[in-house]
């Protein structure tokens, strides 16, 4: 009898463990979602993060906050990955996707407590998500890239929740112009790497400007009296050093008398002069030199020779900038002086050093060439590095919104209107279903209301009253009825110009449901040796 009892006990324990693991996973993931819930919407709060290196970051961008948080639980890290996926797919809605995932996990937890199998929940959630995406595409308004006003409104909605919201009327057109200037008419893709964001401390955010072409923060080298402006520029981008070669660290050169020393100096002069002559022979008159950590990228004697030959020199080009510069200027990086030929050079009408709000920058105007791609530089201004970083992130989000509209040319009303409409339609469709699936769809529909509820709470409104009012308006056919923080209540958000790309919402719902499916299918966590 005793043996039989212990067997049944063991079986009971085994059944209990997966439920405990699942519950612990859901609690961990929801804790992450709750941590950033207050940062959603125009009245959302910012988070101050102190990194391990002592840097201070102030942001309300969901992906930035989660990326910097010290998260230990492996399932909680999945929410960070979901936020990163939303950032790369849509660029905006990184907070919404995490909050939505947390709400769906809460719904799943309630369903698990009712004894419904996790696989059935996960699959029904996926079906409901697919139906939600179909609904979003039905209610979205088509948009043309020629309709500049609609694009600006969509960018303004994205910027309204950021620190830079007061400058949204200025930054939104800038973001639209930047994306459209690098996008072909019928293209469905935009490479945001073709837009270079350059940060400069000084001035205010209102001094931010867009430059059609290339801007470098490095200044022209003037120590040897070289030129600071070149018309009809032929631009060379080199990755080798114009300085005497050094021996290896293990080797030494011993000089016993002054004649040998004189010979070494003569050799150095001849070596450097030979390199400079080869550069001049290829008709290059503007030289960009990559930063080197092994030895001087260019020494004073070489600068003297280059100045005498009338070549403008800009040194300390970062390795990360090489690809952008070669693409923008149409020049190929040159790793050896023997490969320095005219066909590898880029060309521009004018290269000059200009004074921009008290700081010097190098501007390339009228870039032309077979290999040159259209690129844009945006010079971001701000009082300190924290404001600059947050402005860069905000502007990146606005650029991503316009990129979304190039990919999927549809706009939907913001302010929680689409979520309420999907919720209403799913609930209506669930009534015609049979069995457990109807119950799961109802929970999914209720979970979607977390977005308008959070927007209302963060704006200091009575969320229950607002959601009830929205539901009744949507029942009467007002599909664009959402929350307006400006009006402190409900309004037709489409007419109020609170707009967002349909891709942001479709991507958020799809990613959230996939993440929930992954979490629900985990029934144990083991640690490898």
Curated annotation (Swiss-Prot):
Q: Key word Flavoprotein present in the record?
A: no
Domain of life, per lineage: Eukaryota
Note the Gene3D superfamilies from the entry: GroEL (3.50.7.10), GroEL-like equatorial domain (1.10.560.10), TCP-1-like chaperonin intermediate domain (3.30.260.10)
Q: Which SUPFAM superfamilies match?
A: GroEL apical domain-like, GroEL equatorial domain-like, GroEL-intermediate domain like
Signal sequence region: none
Q: Which UniProt keywords apply?
A: ATP-binding, Chaperone, Cytoplasm, Nucleotide-binding
List the GO biological process terms. Answer: chaperone mediated protein folding independent of cofactor
Please give the GO cellular component terms listed in this UniProt entry. Answer: chaperonin-containing T-complex
Q: Does the keyword Hydrolase apply?
A: no
The cross-references to InterPro entries, in alphabetical order and at most eight, read: Chap_CCT_delta, Chaperone_TCP-1, Chaperonin_TCP-1_CS, Cpn60/GroEL/TCP-1, GroEL-like_apical_dom_sf, GROEL-like_equatorial_sf, TCP-1-like_intermed_sf, TCP-1_chaperonin
Q: Name one GO molecular function term.
A: ATP binding
Protein localization: Cytoplasm
Q: How does it assemble?
A: Heterooligomeric complex of about 850 to 900 kDa that forms two stacked rings, 12 to 16 nm in diameter.
Q: What does this protein do?
A: Molecular chaperone; assists the folding of proteins upon ATP hydrolysis. Known to play a role, in vitro, in the folding of actin and tubulin.
Similarity comment text for this entry: Belongs to the TCP-1 chaperonin family.
PANTHER family (alphabetical) = CHAPERONIN
How is this protein named in the record?
Answer: T-complex protein 1 subunit delta
Native source organism of the sequence: Candida glabrata (strain ATCC 2001 / BCRC 20586 / JCM 3761 / NBRC 0622 / NRRL Y-65 / CBS 138)
């Amino acid at each position: 009898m005793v043996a039989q009892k212990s067997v049944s006990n063991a079986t009971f324990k085994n059944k209990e463990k997966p439920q405990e693991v699942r519950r612990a996973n859901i609690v961990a993931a929801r804790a992450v979602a709750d941590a950033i819930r207050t940062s959603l919407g125009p009245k959302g709060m910012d988070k101050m993060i102190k990194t391990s290196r002592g840097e201070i970051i102030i942001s309300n961008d969901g992906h930035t906050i989660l990326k910097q948080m010290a998260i230990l639980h492996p399932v909680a890290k999945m929410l960070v990955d979901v936020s990163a996926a939303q950032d790369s797919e849509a660029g905006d809605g990184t907070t919404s996707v995490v909050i939505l995932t947390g709400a769906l996990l809460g719904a799943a937890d309630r369903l698990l407590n009712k004894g419904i199998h996790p696989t059935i929940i996960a699959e029904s959630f996926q079906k409901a998500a697919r139906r939600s995406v179909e609904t979003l595409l039905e209610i979205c308004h088509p948009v043309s890239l020629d309709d500049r006003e609609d694009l600006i409104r969509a960018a303004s909605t994205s910027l309204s929740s950021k620190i830079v919201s007061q400058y949204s009327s200025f930054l939104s057109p800038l973001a639209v112009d930047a994306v459209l200037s690098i996008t072909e008419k019928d293209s469905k893709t935009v490479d945001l790497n073709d837009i270079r964001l350059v940060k400069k401390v000084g001035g205010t955010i209102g001094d931010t400007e867009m430059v059609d072409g290339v801007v470098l923060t490095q200044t022209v080298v003037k120590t040897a009296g070289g030129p600071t402006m070149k018309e009809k520029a032929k631009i060379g981008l080199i990755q080798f050093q114009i300085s005497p070669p050094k021996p290896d660290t293990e080797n030494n050169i011993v000089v016993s008398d002054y004649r040998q020393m004189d010979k070494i100096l003569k050799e150095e002069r001849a070596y450097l002069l030979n390199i400079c002559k080869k550069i001049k022979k290829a008709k290059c008159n503007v030289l960009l030199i990559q930063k080197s950590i092994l030895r001087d990228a260019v020494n004073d004697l070489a600068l003297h020779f280059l100045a005498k030959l009338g070549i403008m020199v800009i040194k300390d080009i970062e390795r990360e900038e090489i690809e952008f510069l070669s693409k923008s200027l149409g020049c190929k990086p040159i790793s050896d002086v023997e490969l320095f030929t005219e066909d590898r050079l880029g060309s521009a009408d004018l290269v000059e050093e200009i004074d921009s709000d008290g700081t010097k920058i190098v501007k390339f105007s009228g870039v032309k060439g077979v290999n040159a791609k259209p690129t844009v530089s945006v010079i971001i201004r701000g009082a300190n590095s924290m404001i600059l970083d947050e402005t860069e992130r905000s502007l990146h989000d606005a650029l991503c919104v316009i990129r979304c509209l190039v990919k999927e040319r549809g706009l939907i009303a913001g302010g929680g209107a689409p979520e309420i409409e999907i919720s209403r339609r799913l609930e209506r469709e669930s009534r015609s279903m049979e069995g457990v699936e109807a119950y799961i769809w109802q929970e999914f529909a209720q979970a979607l209301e977390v977005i308008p509820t959070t927007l209302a709470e963060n704006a200091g409104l009575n969320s229950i009253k607002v959601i009830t009012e929205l539901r009744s308006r949507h029942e009467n056919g007002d599909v664009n009825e959402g929350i307006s923080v400006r009006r402190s209540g409900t309004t037709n958000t489409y007419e109020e110009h609170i707009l967002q790309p349909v891709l942001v919402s479709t991507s958020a719902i799809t990613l959230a449901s996939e993440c929930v499916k992954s979490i629900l299918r985990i029934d144990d966590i083991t640690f490898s040796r």
